Amino acid sequence: MRAVFDTNIFISALAIPGRRAETALLKVAEGGLQLAISQAIIHEVLDVLARKFDRNPEELSRVAVYLSELAEVVTPRRRLKVLRDEPDNRILECAATAKAEVIVTGDQAMLALGEYRGIRILSLKDFLAGVFP
């Protein structure tokens, strides 16, 4: 299964260990899932970690390398304007480019969308229950 994680999933996993988001990343690292990411998502993760969690440049560099090795980095060629929040559109672009089957998010606007071009949009709880019961 190919998946794209929203920025909030990465932030929860990287900044607040021991939660469901970390479990999801560990499953990816174990090879239980193919994950795709774009440079825009990586940049947003790094920006949030720097601003809200006071991570230093060395830590941010390690996170960038980790994410690039954990997931396939894709380059969306088309800009979408489906959701009001621009960073959410970057998630949709990544998922469409990667031909993902699922987007995992905690974002209510994305969850309300439910599906985009055949790509299911699930909460982390529903994703873990369905993929890694």
Tell me the role of every PLM-derived stretch.
Residues 5-7, 37-38, 106-107, 123-124:
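A secondary-structure boundary/capping signal
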Residues 1-37:
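Short, well-structured N-terminal submotif of metal-dependent ribonuclease cores
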Residues 69-103, 108:
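Active-site neighborhoods of divalent-metal-dependent phosphate/nucleic-acid chemistry enzymes
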Residues 11, 42-43, 110, 128:
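Alpha-helix N-cap/helix-start and coil->helix boundary motif
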Residues 108-133:
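Acidic, PIN/NYN-like endoribonuclease modules and their adjacent C-terminal/linker elements
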Residues 27, 94, 113:
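Hydrophobic/aromatic ligand-binding patch that stacks against planar heteroaromatic rings
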Residues 26-82:
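PIN-domain endoribonuclease scaffold, especially VapC-family toxins
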